[in-house]
Regions:
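N-terminal helix-turn-helix DNA-binding core of bacterial DNA-binding proteins
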Residues: 1-42
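Amphipathic alpha-helical dimerization/coiled-coil segments
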Residues: 15, 79-103
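Basic amphipathic alpha-helical segments that dock to polyanions
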Residues: 43-50
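Beta-hairpin "wing" of winged helix-turn-helix
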Residues: 51-68, 73
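Accessory beta->alpha helical hairpin/"wing" motif in late/C-terminal subdomains of nucleic-acid enzymes
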Residues: 74-78
Length: 103
């Protein structure tokens, strides 16, 4: 995965719905049809990095089975950052598509 891509994916998915790390990895895998398999060794450093930057926040919740889980959600700063990054990502994706069409 390209540098920064995981951060972008995490922000995008958390903007749709707050969730815990395990469910986030499952959603990434399902949405990408098993193309993107993110392990805990990559995901949790990304979550901590985004939290330190103030783009997401974490809170502990009690699950249905009585366990505690850390749920992550996007902050206002994270939503603004995501909006800015959408244009950048669209340009990047367009450029990559053009390069990949070269024969």
């Amino acid at each position: 995965m390209l540098q920064g891509t995981l951060d972008r994916i995490v922000l995008q998915l958390l903007s749709a719905e707050p969730t815990n790390g395990y469910d986030l990895t499952q959603r990434i895998c399902a949405i990408s049809r098993d193309t993107l398999n993110v392990n805990a060794g990559s995901l949790y450093p990304a979550l901590y990095r985004l939290e330190r930057r103030g783009l997401i926040r974490a809170r502990w919740v009690q699950t249905e089975n009585g366990r505690r889980a850390k749920v992550y959600s996007v902050t206002a700063a994270g939503r603004a950052h995501l909006t800015d990054q959408r244009e950048t990502w669209a340009r990047f994706a367009s450029a990559m598509a053009a390069v990949l069409r070269v024969t």
